[in-house]
Structure formats: structure tokens, C-alpha cells
């Protein structure tokens, strides 16, 4: 600045110092200087904002066109069909807009927001605000807003009692007051059935069945830790948790309205749809149909011609008690001696059965047993009652007899130390020899071998070894003797052999 003061000014400054400072700052609102010499769109030309000046139409002669034009078209204003059909709304006079802008500027200056004035018109107004203004606020609302802004400018918190002094209402709360808090109930229309004919024995019950059955024990409330306590108290703990609300909801609540605007008793009297609460209401779920047409218990179904047994599947323990789960080894070797009787070295023959005779009829029903045979047993057969023994161990795995007839050479040589079995008598050997099963054909042996001839089914004398060719066989050639159709043959009677053995010849 000092250098500029010493040097001679080549040209005078067009603006003073204050104007220069104003021009160096930004200004709000449209700047008309920006639109000078710029191309405008069709919408800006047809729908210009109020501050803009419409350019006069050029009077230059139009260039020669292919089709001749009517000279009356140039004199008429060129507008679009939509603009001609729907003209824009009438704008307020320019003086009214300037007065509104001046009031708004004074209100903004009162809030410590100082803006430099601009020489251009329409400062602080947008195009939409200038074209489409909203309705003005009442004078009382303006004073409240202006006073609230002044208080807010001085201090963020208004002076006075903070519990009684609330935040001033907003523009929406001032312009749109709430409706009537207690509207008058309307009479029910006739086409909806008229007044409610159902009379319910409804009484208000705030507590539930769970609260009635499981009541809390009386006692002081639990003490809270100081570190866990909060400075924000959401309601009074002595009253209940019903008045719990946040600070924003408490500040921006409807003015001069009761706390409980919903009358439950009044709503219950005029309601048609009854909500049944499970377990709390007095409605016992009784209907006319349930009272008069009650469900009767059905009679038991009995089938008189049913001869089917209970089940064809054998149960696991049909005859419970000791001795019902015996194994084959325990059955043949008898029960172990009681602890009072000392064990003897030789087991008597009455308690020992070392061989299974396949042809003995007494053991037929014990070992060859089916499901049907056990379910449909004959009347003369009775189950053997076994002596109770407390030292009998339950086992489902048959272990076999373990005698020398079913042992290998290794098992015969390496025997564990146990009670030796009784010696085999001659009577037992003879009974074992003569108790084999006889085939139904008797002595007719169609496919005989050397082994079968030397060791036949029935005992035919002492066994004698013969030195013969083992490849030689005795297969009958031809067909056997054909008997008549009416001839009866007893299969149990031994038949004469077709080819006699060499010893019998």
C-alpha cells in the first residue's frame, strides 16, 4: 500500500476503499454479472426469475427460408404450448420481496452472523424462494423465534429453572397444534351391527397370572454400584417404569396434553373385536355348542371273533426269574453247587448230560423249537421248572458242550484245570450207537459208497477194516424194482438192501 501511495496512479480507482472491500467478499444470491454474454437455455429465457430483464426481440430480418412465414408470427410473443396452456403463477411485486429480504437480513444480523451488503437485488434469496414463496408466519411466532435466537446467541442454555423452562416450540408445533386429546366417541353405525350386544365380565387386570402365582419377596431394592450408576434418570423408580422416556421425548412432547390420553375403559365399551389374553381374562372359552353338544367318550372297541395271540415275536424274558436265561453249557453241565456244599471231584450222572442224542424224543422239544411251536405249544407239554439259583449268570451266547467229541487235538492236549467229567459207561455208548436217526427209505441205498457200506446207519455188527481199493464204489446199475400203484409200503419198516455187503454174502 505504501508503494502504491508513492507511485503516481496511472488511472483513477473506480471504487472506493469500502466498495472495494465489499466487492472482495462473497455475496449471497444470484449474480447478474455472471450471466452477461453467456448463452441461456430455453427454460431460462421463457421462465426467467423476477429480477431478470427480458431481452427485446431482435428486429433483424430473418434469413430467407424455404417456406414463407406469416409476418404476424413475429409480432406475437413466442411461447410454448405448455406455457400458453399453463401460465406461471403471478409473482409478488418486487418491493414486497425487498422488504422481506431486509427483515431477514436484520434477523440474521441479530444472531452474530454479519454479512456485507451487496448492491445486487435479491440478496439471500434462492431462485425457488424468489419464485415460489411460502406463507408468512404470524407476528407472535416471529417475535418468539427472534427472541429465542437472541437468547441462543447470548448463551447456549436459557437462564432460569431448567426443570420448568423447556425448549421453545418449533415452527411445526406452533403452526400445527395437536388434535383434541379426548375425541367424543361416535355412535356405531347401523350397517355395522349397531351397538355391541355382547356383555363381557371384563375387569381391568394389570398383573398377569405369572405375577399372581410367583410374587416377589418384599425387600429393599438392590443397591447399585457407584461406577454403574448413570446421571440420566429415566423416570422415578418409586412409581414404576411407566413414565420412562428419553430427554428428547420429554422435551418435544405435545403441549398442554394429559399424560394418559387413551382411556382403556372407554375404548373397551365401544370395541367390537375382543382380544382374549391367555390366562388373564375371565373369558372361559365357553360356547353354546360346547355346553349343549359336549363330546362323549367313545366305547371301547371289542372284536369278539379275534383268536389271534398277543404276538408272534418271542419276548426276551417270557418267564422271569432265576434259570430263565440258561445257556446250553449250563443246561447240560447242571447248576453250580451252592456255597454251603463243597464241590466234589466226580459229578454224578444224574446231573451230567455229555451227549446230545438226536433221536431221543425227550429232547426233541427242547432243542428243535420254532416261533410257532413255542407260541402254539400242545397242552400235554409243560415247561420244565428249574431250580432257583442266585449264582446263575445271565448269558445269551451258547458256548457248546466242551466235551471231547467236539474238541480238537490241541484242545484235548491243553485243557484247563477243571472238574473232570464222569467216565463214559457202556450203557451210554450203546444208547448212542442205537439212537441215530433212520432215513425214511430204510435199507434202500441208491447212492452207496465204500464208507457208507462199512459204516452204515444202523449198527450191523462189529466194524472190520477191509483192504480194498478206495476208488471202487457200489452204485446200482439200472432202476430199482418198481412196485404197483396200490401197493402200500411202510417207510418205518426196514427194507431189504438191493445189494448185500460182501460180509453178508
From Swiss-Prot:
Region described as Disordered: spans on this chain = 172-194
> Which Pfam families does this UniProt record tie to the protein?
SAXO5-like
What are the boundaries of the region Mn 4?
448-462
The record's tissue-specificity note reads: Highly expressed in testis.
- Tell me the segments the record calls region Mn 3: 407-419
This protein's superkingdom? Eukaryota
Region annotated Mn 1 sits at: 125-137
Region named Mn 2: 169-183
Name of the protein in its database record: Stabilizer of axonemal microtubules 5
